[in-house]
A protein has these predicted regions:
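Structural/interface elements that position substrates and couple domains in central-metabolism enzymes
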Residues: 1-387
């Protein structure tokens, strides 16, 4: 808590450290482990506990301490039925509180922007009073025209998981079609642009080579799949999307193996290990899975990432050599792989990169770089979905 109060958050999130420090200094943000003081003073308490057991304990404890029935708003991902189960536990214990499901849709690396400019606010509650108070709290967003969806708790809980599954389906679709592009001489990047301009489709999450990662992505889809199975519903599209997402690293490995004839006893540098730019999270990262696959096939791997090396080390267990710059990751390598679409990689000195590599081969799994420029410089450039 002391570290957090100083703005030293244990993860990387663009602009968040500065916001925390500014608001702590202004007295608007206080960190404390004294749950009793909050329970006795606050009318509305937002619960960001990520463990179902802990969430239940916190709800019961606050409800016992609060002088009047509090409004307890759950903002972290929870399985469908959580709010209903909490209400039953409260009733059985003779306690009172209003439980609201308000799923937040924060994207790693864009959380501050997502909070300030959300696509919508979801309020899952049958209490008109709770809805009115929450609309007052989020008045600046409401006045800005952010849509507010008021629904029951189960629907609010299901929105989060369904949104994750839909995005996974969209990502998996463009990755499947990008494989077809490679066979027929089409360009998946241009195809994705054309598809995204269709108002029925929209451009976000249509980047060939992108995977479905993040801390909650797998758990959201697991929870939705389990809910469907428990209720006798077959979610075939979700199952197929997950299969495609899980196979992405194998497809990328095949690209590298084809460019090098084989990856065994080859030296491969990877630029980027985070699952996406502007985050240190490697949860569900296709780049980390690719590094593991390369090592398993006998390759020697070096890697560089601006912020995710610490998290990656916990996943890769010493099987990869970590570098302090992109140039160190390229030196003496048979191929250089772009694993994460960090914008700074576009600004690298590719003349220098070319002289550092044993072979001027770049496998760009995110289609981040200027392929025409690199080929003109003498690189063998391999992208995703670019026939």
């Amino acid at each position: 808590m002391v570290e957090m109060a100083q703005g030293n958050i244990p993860f990387f999130e663009k602009n968040l450290k500065e916001i925390i420090r500014r608001n702590v200094r202004a007295g608007r943000l206080v960190y404390s482990t004294d749950i009793e003081s909050f329970a006795r003073k606050a009318q509305v308490i937002f619960l960001a506990e990520d463990s179902a057991d802990h969430l239940s304990d916190v709800v019961m404890r606050i409800s016992r301490l609060a002088p009047t029935p509090p409004i307890l708003t759950i903002v972290t991902p929870v399985s469908v039925g959580t709010a209903s189960a909490l209400e039953k536990s409260l009733k059985d214990a003779g306690l009172q509180a209003t439980i609201v499901s308000q799923p937040m849709f924060f994207t790693d690396g864009c959380a501050v922007e997502d909070f300030n400019w959300p696509d919508r606010l979801i309020l899952g509650s049958t209490s008109n009073e709770a809805v009115h108070i929450l609309k007052q709290i989020f008045h600046p967003l409401v006045m800005r025209g952010v849509p507010v969806i008021v629904t029951n708790q189960a629907t609010a809980e299901l929105v989060r998981e369904s949104a994750t599954a839909f995005v996974a389906t969209k990502i998996s679709f463009i990755n499947e079609v990008s494989a077809l592009c490679e066979r027929v001489g089409a360009d998946a990047v241009s195809l994705a642009l054309a598809l995204g301009l269709d108002k029925k489709i929209a451009p976000r999450c249509l980047q060939p080579g992108a995977g479905m990662g993040g801390v909650f992505a797998e758990s959201d889809m697991d929870s939705l799949a389990q809910l469907a199975q428990a209720n006798g519903v077959s979610l075939k599209v979700l199952s197929a999307a997950r299969d495609v997402n899980h196979s992405l690293a194998d497809r990328l490995l095949d690209k590298i193996a084809l460019a090098l004839d084989s990856v065994e006893n080859k030296d491969v540098g990877i630029l980027g290990l985070a699952f996406k730019p502007n985050t240190n999270s490697v949860a569900g990262s296709s780049a980390v899975s690719l590094a593991q696959s390369l090592v398993a096939k006998g390759a020697r791997v070096r890697a560089y990432d601006p912020v995710a090396l610490s998290d990656a080390k916990n996943r890769l267990n010493g099987s990869v050599r970590y570098c302090d710059s992109a140039y160190s990751a390229a030196e003496g390598m048979d191929a250089l792989v772009v694993g994460t679409g960090w914008p700074e990689f576009r600004a690298l000195d590719f003349d220098r990169i070319k002289h550092l590599l044993k072979k001027p081969i770049i496998v760009d799994t995110k289609n981040l770089l200027d392929s025409s420029r690199l080929r003109a410089m003498g690189f063998e450039y391999v992208g995703v979905g670019r026939g």
